[in-house]
Amino acid sequence: MITSFKLSKQKKITHGFFNRNGGKSDGIYKSLNCGPGSHDKRNKVIENLRIVKNKICKKTKNIVLLHQIHSKKILFIDKNFRFNKKKVKADAIITGQKKIPIAVLTADCVPI
C-alpha cells in the first residue's frame, strides 16, 4: 500500500493507493486484481478486495466499488447507506461516514 504524506496528516481518514503487487490472482491476472468486471476467477477477485479492505479498515465486511460510466454522477454515502450486491453506476464517491471503505478502480487513469 502506498500512502500520501499530506493525506497521512489527516487523522480522521485512512487511505491507500495499491498497485498490482501482493494479490491472489494467477495466470494472466497474476496481480492484486480487484476488478469484478474482469474475467478473473470471482473468488480471487474477492480475496484481493479483502486484502485491500483489511489494509484500509478491518472493522467492516464490505468495500464500496462503483461501476464507472464516465459521467458526472457522484455517489454520496450518508448514514442511511446500505450495502447491496449491485454496484452503483457513478464515477466518484464522497462520504463522511466512518468504517465504510470506498474504492475507485483505475487502469490507465489517475485517481483524484
Predicted segments, located by residue:
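Active-site microenvironment for binding and transforming phosphate-containing groups
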Residues: 1-112
